[in-house]
Amino acid sequence: MEQTWDSYISSLNQNSLPRQVEVTQGRYSGSLENLSFSKGDIITVVDLEPVFVRAELKDGDQVLDVVTIPLRYEGNFQLMADPVSFETVADLTRSVRLPQSPVAPRSPPRFQNSIPISADNLPMKLRKGETLSLIGFQESRGRRLLQCKVLRKKPPLTVLLPMDCRGHFLECQDDRFYSIDTIVRWKMLAGRKRTVRVQARHHPKLLGPLVPEHFRGHLVLYPCFSVTANLLGETRVSIPSDLDISVTEIARLDRKPRTTMRQIYSMEESKFPVRVKIMNVVQSESKEYPKPLKRGQLLTILKTEEVKKFVASEISQGKKGKCFLVPYTYQGLVLRRGRYFYAVSDVAAAMKHGELCFQASQDYTSYLGSFASFRANECFLALKKSVVSAEIHGELHRVEVLKCLNIATKAHVKLPLFAVGKFLELFDGARPGTLQELCQVTRLPCHVRVTSPDPSMTVDPLYGTKELRIENVIIEQCLIAKDEPTLEDIISSADMYREWPETTFEIPIEKISCEVLVVEERSWIADVRKERCRPLQSIQEVTKESLAFSNCLVIRRPPPPVPKPRSLF
């Protein structure tokens, strides 16, 4: 079916890439963009990168304004549930972007089935109205299945739904708020319009000069993408999504279709090891992936593996610097340090699991008699969060406070959540240990200092940092690979096997968009003990953006505002 380029790109999400299309109506854009397409040209779409978002501001059915929202826009938005159901699981996965990792992010998409569901591989029939949390994909006996959690079951039941399963799935209302960057990358519905509301405390005038002061309507988002694509002759280009051409999708180009690392990961375990040739590759120019792949390179994919990693941020004077992915098996010794809290609201958020001691590093003066002031170096024991009534500017307001014990004076005080003190957590001394050992006795996030480097690494980038914040533990889906051996290696196969632990490396399938050609399924080495294939220890420096939109990085919320006189509103 012929479509405009813009319409076709809007129908895609990362789950379905790469895709190949044929140009049915060409376009010449001159020497500035250097993009010229003729009828019959073949384009392989390998990646979509959002650039900005156009949005219609609507009050009911009336369009008030059309604005452009940059990806770094600071305001947050709430999703409005899509009112139209998806008939089958295949329809659902074509529209909803899902993580390829089996570990669910903090806010996985949730849907309800409008009709009962029964399938051969389900342990029980799912009744109408079950809430399903969509986790990711799983391959079984050559079939791609959708992995879900049935939330009303205790404990939650994990089920695998085939693509042809009918459920008339309706999106559930999500009460969370997200940045525009997170929405465009993870929360859009391919082929459908995404409608959002502005966060109540956000000033709507920041969206545009024509937005009413008390705007309570909604926005319809139209993201614009930069499309990474391959042209004939392995030329790689970036194509804007609003290019004026028409295309039609094609199934495959030759008898030996190319596949992706993601599809290789989904193969049955019995088909490994497999030999592949890299046909083209897209990978970040940052330090996120330490071993670059090259076009024409031959690899032996030994197995798939779910690799646990710590997400760590370097801390300097209370501010975050570099971010790292640290192997779960990291053997450097660390010493726990107190966490940094900007405001009292951060202390309250951190004490969910018990009482907490903290020290102020700057003075705070309260102009309200019911709330306490404090000076730098004063120490407190946080007891519990509460709400009190206080007279502010002659008016009675309900204010959230943290009830604390002043450790020096033994006085019980109330600190408002909006008070800023740049606090440091206090706790009893602890012995050095590994990150794994630390996670067994404390909850993440926590702050540490590396006291001894990992002995297996030539250079440990964490050793020498003043302070690290261990944010989270993630699981990356990886292919364990080695460079294809030479003829001499194959002849002396025993030597090759002996070298595997030193030469294998990880290929994280979420970080590399790569087309490969399967050269040979190497069943003749299937009897080799795969447990010997261990990738080398490596610490990867990653960008904050790559962690933020994938829900791996814990982002501090600003403290609540100081109550203002109602006469100002």
Swiss-Prot record:
Region feature (CABIT 2): 255-523
Entry superkingdom: Eukaryota
Region named CABIT 1: 1-254
Tissue specificity: Specifically expressed in the intestine.
Residues of the signal peptide: none
Pfam families named in the record: CABIT
Family according to the record: Belongs to the themis family.
Protein name as annotated: Protein THEMIS3
Protein source organism: Mus musculus (Mouse)
